[in-house]
Structures are given as structure tokens and as C-alpha cells.
Amino acid sequence: PQLLILDEPANYLDLLYQKQVFDLIREWVKKPGRAVVSVVHDLSLAKAYGTNAVLMHRGRIISSGSVGEVLSKANLRVAYDMDIYEWMNKMLSQWQ
């Protein structure tokens, strides 16, 4: 196939296997003419592995474009009705 359409391809996997799945997808898509469209709710995975994104809230598109543009603090606040950056930093600080 030249196009993979995936719905949460690493859902319920341990972290090691999530990384392996996305590393395999990244290698597969490097060949010319190939593309991947994937639903991913894990923002860290989307940011690490995605190139373009569509951010939705209540069935409507809020933003689409490069991952960096789409996953901005302002867009995420609209999508999640909270400061995602603050929450994720708080969660990460537990590991430091």
C-alpha cells in the first residue's frame, strides 16, 4: 500500500512498544509516494512523530497545518478547555 490509515496504532501498548510502532511507521513512510494518516490522541506522540495535524473540538476543526502550529498553547487551550502545557509540565515534574 502507498497510504496507511491508522486509528490509534499504539493504543494500550507499553511505552517501549509505542516507540517501536511509531519508529516503524516513520521508516515505512520515508519511501517516496507513501503517506500515513493517523488518529493520535497522545499529544506527545503527535508532536514527536507527526508532520501535519488537524486539531478538533466537539467535532469541529480548530486548526490544521504543521504540528508546531496546530499544537500551540492557544489552540490546545481551546480544544481542551484548560492549559495543557501547564498540566503536562506538572505531570512531567513528578519524574524529575
PLM-predicted stretches and their roles:
Residues 4-8:
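Catalytic Walker B motif of ABC-type/P-loop ATPase nucleotide-binding domains
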Residues 15-17:
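Helix N-cap at the start of a conserved alpha-helix in ABC-type nucleotide-binding domains
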Residues 19-31:
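Helical segment within the ABC ATPase nucleotide-binding domain
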Residues 40-41:
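H-loop/switch region of ABC-family ATPase nucleotide-binding domains
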Residues 46-48:
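A short, surface-exposed alpha-helical micro-motif characterized by mixed small hydrophobic
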Residues 64-65:
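ABC ATPase "signature
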Residues 73-96:
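ABC ATPase nucleotide-binding domains
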